[in-house]
Structure formats: structure tokens, C-alpha cells
Amino acid sequence: MAASTTLALSHPKTLAAAAAAAPKAPTAPAAVSFPVSHAACAPLAARRRAVTAMVAAPPAVGAAMPSLDFDTSVFNKEKVSLAGHEEYIVRGGRNLFPLLPEAFKGIKQIGVIGWGSQGPAQAQNLRDSLAEAKSDIVVKIGLRKGSKSFDEARAAGFTEESGTLGDIWETVSGSDLVLLLISDAAQADNYEKIFSHMKPNSILGLSHGFLLGHLQSAGLDFPKNISVIAVCPKGMGPSVRRLYVQGKEINGAGINSSFAVHQDVDGRATDVALGWSVALGSPFTFATTLEQEYKSDIFGERGILLGAVHGIVEALFRRYTEQGMDEEMAYKNTVEGITGIISKTISKKGMLEVYNSLTEEGKKEFNKAYSASFYPCMDILYECYEDVASGSEIRSVVLAGRRFYEKEGLPAFPMGNIDQTRMWKVGEKVRSTRPENDLGPLHPFTAGVYVALMMAQIEVLRKKGHSYSEIINESVIESVDSLNPFMHARGVAFMVDNCSTTARLGSRKWAPRFDYILTQQAFVTVDKDAPINQDLISNFMSDPVHGAIEVCAELRPTVDISVPANADFVRPELRQSS
């Protein structure tokens, strides 16, 4: 992208204007004139041609990738090249903790509102990092009166007596930086009261752009007398804390984070956001916008991060057992392989190494699975992205949160279990006899389906104009380094239900869609012995994303996350061992 189209993070309107002024990418073929999400009335062949045109085009076709530059007076900014696109990052490390008081200049209290997935991790990491920096900034937890989370916060060392635990509204009013980490649905229902309690010139910190999407859908915006920033760890809260603790002796390890400055009233926002990210232990921090973040994040959770991987292992397990495979072997060839050897290989060496590790016969089976699965996966992913971007999925989350309680004479409908079927009971048995450090088998068909899903998600985000750092973190790194290890440890619910309410809802909603489309379209194509789409295989082999992943791999956490079955850093209701 030309230098003249570099975009300022603090001015979203400037971003939109610059994007409009940027050189236009070549026009996509007319076949993509209808979105997949509304293509039910179009013939299947036409839908396939539309998606084929989308994939066959060079990666540059589609929305232009923004060049998100930023200025910092505290930390060192580095330029990296990802697939030919220049981006800027800040490396983390405990050696940077002495810079935190300068980054947080003018802040006396950081209020952490909520104690769900991210709250406990971020509060403890911030407290510990600031203590190491010998800062007198107070990290205070704010909870609603009567919350059961008070006991959990006290157990983590936050107390009323020390002024580090208290009422939500007192905490919001008394904080210079308010980290709003309650559920997205709760944010949507309470934002007006939260805004009214914030001090002028204070800073609102978000770890998800959901609230912006909700406000946009209502034609609203944030108050103009506060700064609005985001630091969004690319992993669940328990991973953020676990890797921070594991990395204490080796200059830090944690979860990569994106950051955004949506509104800056006094020029401090960028350094505060970067300080927040460094204090969380982020190995590297990359820039995004609040809008790009919520679109990629909500979409990613429903895709390969949670929902789609759940859907494909259910579909594959059923396929293998119907073909006569032993149940335990079927579980090993699906869940164990994806969360073990496949994730480990992608994390350290990339997707191509998964393919190159196969025998010649295995590569043929991989190609069949990849060729048959890519377009069906993209079909659902494309629909999901547009549901998020249009606000439909955001509205769905808000309404679902309200159904958790009795209303209008109807009963409450909280989230139900997702690990009570035969497959997941078999998984308990497999894990009970699994040798230590066993990574499961590399099944070529499973690998082909999983990698096809990953590449389809990468392609949708790329065509929608997301930066490579965001694409790779939301489609690859978060999946293999943060989330899959939890499913490997104790099954799908242990992975999904340690995440946010928005992620848990989305995973439950979209997982069946991936299961269905793979069963009805991809596997049927394989069973018919349909020709392999050699263009798809060739595009996979030569895709520039592989080089970008190599660069990101050099910035990965310095340790691998360890998730024991009896982990005590997860949600309280999930702490009992299987």
C-alpha cells in the first residue's frame, strides 16, 4: 500500500477516508456479486463459481490491507514484513517492566471490571508486573454487589481492606483507566451507566471491540470526554495467566495481543495501550482498529478457533466409526491428532510441514480431503463473517444473554453442556491411558480437512482487508498455541467454556453448521471419488501466508503452554479433573 494511504489509529474516520482514496484493487469477477450468506436461492454451481473466483484471484484482490502505523514515546517500534506487507509491532518482555510507570503516567488506579475469562488473568498480570516495576499504581477489581466472584478475587489476593476490591460503580468512578472485562451482553445492557460514572479524561480499556459494534448498530458512539483503547489478547484468559506465570524465569512469555486506539483525548492513549499489553506479558503487540478487531475476533471464535474445530472433529469421528474404525482410534485420529501433533507442527514449522511430514500415499489422502473441504468450509465462514460485519451476530449475542433469565412468561435458557455424547466419553477413556507428552497420530485425511479450514479462514480475512498479523493470530497462532491445548487436556468443553460468553455462544451456534456441511458436501465428494482440484492444492503450496507465518513463529511465546488436567488457573466450575 502506498505511503500516502498510511492510516492514523486514533481517527477511524480518517481510516475510512484513506481507504476510499487508496488505489482500487482489480474488480473481482461478476460471479461474486451475491454473498454466500444469502445465496440459498442461487444454484449450487453458481455459488461454487462465486467462491472459486474469490479464491483463484491473487491475494491483493479484495479490500485493501491497511498500513496501521503508530507513534510511541516509551517503547521501541519495529517494522516487520509479512507476505510483502509492512506492519509495525512492539516486542514484550519483563525487561520492559521498568518502563510501565512512564507508559502509565497520570494513572493512579486501574479498575478491572469483571471476573470472567479475561478479568482474573489481566488483573493478576497487571498487579504482578507493576509490583516488579516498583510502581504504586493500584489495580482494583470492581464487581456488582452480591457477586459470587468476590471470593475468587479474594483468593487471588485482592481485598477490600487493601483497597484492591470493591463495588463496580465505585471502582469505575475512582479509576483513571477502566478495563471493562464483563461479558459483551452485559456491556451492551449497561454501557450508559458505565459511561456516566467515568471521570472526564479517563481511559476506557476494552479487550474486545464488541461494544463498538453494538454502538454502531444503534447509531451511537463513545462519549467524547474519554479516551477509548483496546488491548486484545489472542487467547482465553486462563492462557494469558498460565503463560505469564510459566515465563517468569525467562524474561516473559504470554499471549500475543492486538491493540487499537479508537479515541485519544490527551495524547496518552497509545503508550497506555502498549504499556497495558506489555504488562500482560504479550510477546509481541500489533496494531489494528477496534472495528477490525471485533470483526475478526467474533468471526474467528465461530471459525477455526472454537466452533469450526468442534464441528469438524464431530463429523470426522462419526465418519471414521461408521467406516469401522475403533472408537478410541477414531478419537485419537481426530481430537488427539489435531490438538497434538498437527497443532505442534503448525506452531513450530507451519502448515506446509504437516503436508511434508506425510508419506506419498498420505499426501494423496490429504489432497482429497483438502480439495473436498475447502469450499464447504469457506461457504460457512463467508456467511459467518458477513453476519458479524452486518451486526446480526452481535445482536444474536445480546439477545441470547437476555434469555439466560426468565422473562415474558418463558423459562430461562442458560448454555447447556457440549461434551456429553459418546464421542467425548470415549475421549475421557483415551486421556486416562494416554502416555505423557503423547501428541496423537498424524492422520492425513484429518490433517487435510483441518488445514483446508485454516486456509479458508485465512482467505476470507485476507479478502476482507485484515492485516496479516491479525489474520495469522486469529486463524493460526491462537488456535494452535492457546486454545487447542485445552481440548487436548480435557475435551471440547474445557476449551470452549474457559472462553468468553460471546465465544461460548458462538461456538455452540456455528459448530453444527460445519459438521453438517462437511458431512453433506465434503465427505460425499470424497466418497464419489471426484477429481481433486489441483489449482487449490497448487495455491496452498505457494500461498504467501506460509512465509508470513514463519516470521510470526520467530515471535511466538518462549515456552509452550502446559495445561494439566487438574489446572487451577481456569474457571472455578471447570477445575474438577476428568
UniProtKB/Swiss-Prot annotation:
Signal peptide: none annotated. It comes from Oryza sativa subsp. japonica (Rice). Its EC number is 1.1.1.86. Its cofactor is Mg(2+). It is found in: Plastid, Chloroplast. This is Ketol-acid reductoisomerase, chloroplastic. The active site is at 208. Gene3D superfamilies: N-(1-d-carboxylethyl)-l-norvaline Dehydrogenase, domain 2, NAD(P)-binding Rossmann-like Domain. Belongs to the ketol-acid reductoisomerase family. Residues 90-288 form the KARI N-terminal Rossmann domain. The keyword Chloroplast applies. Binds 2 magnesium ions per subunit. It is an enzyme of class 1 (oxidoreductase).
